[in-house]
């Protein structure tokens, strides 16, 4: 059911435990390139820790997201979760996404945060549960970094609704040119990857909502075959067309 995640599986560079202090130069270079496999290999080799990586992304969000409005909420447990993945790695864990921060479109339920679909009507909608997709990401070792902005109700409003605008998050901006569209409805997931707020994000698509933001922001994103990824606990539009899928900077990472 989740076979698309196999594309994200990371080949570890070594089997050595983490013993080296954070190399900020290497970390910054890898964040800029955004390749999930390279980042995972560096984590496995002890070039830096998941804690340092997570804090680096959180610092970027704090510094730049006021302009881009890609992020709706940060997981308050993200740094602690990163520390746990460092401990797991030192104990020999080889989970495929171990210690990789991932951002989640805010129409997908996560236990730590409300799921709003960008709408004021759902602003306090905290269900305290994970969608099966999120449970699979956690099982693979991913760190849920936070939730991303989107076209409100995933654009299930009108043909003239603004791409990337929601009453909760405002207007998402395209980091490459804030005057151009970020497209939608997975606008925040796309803008977040383009701004290097995480190496991997999850969007959803009914008709173009992953591929369009990926296209206009220089990313790779794809819509898996409907039914391959569980639709459970994702705010619905169409049972025959809805699916979640990955968005990243390159083919290897997506």
Tell where the protein language model's regions lie, with residue ranges:
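Fold-level recognition of mixed alpha/beta catalytic cores in primary-metabolism enzymes, strongest
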Residues: 159, 163-166, 190-254
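Hydrophobic alpha-helical membrane context
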Residues: 15, 117-118, 217
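Short, flexible, solvent-exposed loop/turn segments with mixed acidic/basic and small polar residues
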Residues: 4, 58-60, 233-236
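Gly/Ser-rich catalytic/binding loops embedded in alpha/beta enzyme cores
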Residues: 22-207, 225
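Bacterial N-terminal signal peptides
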Residues: 4-15
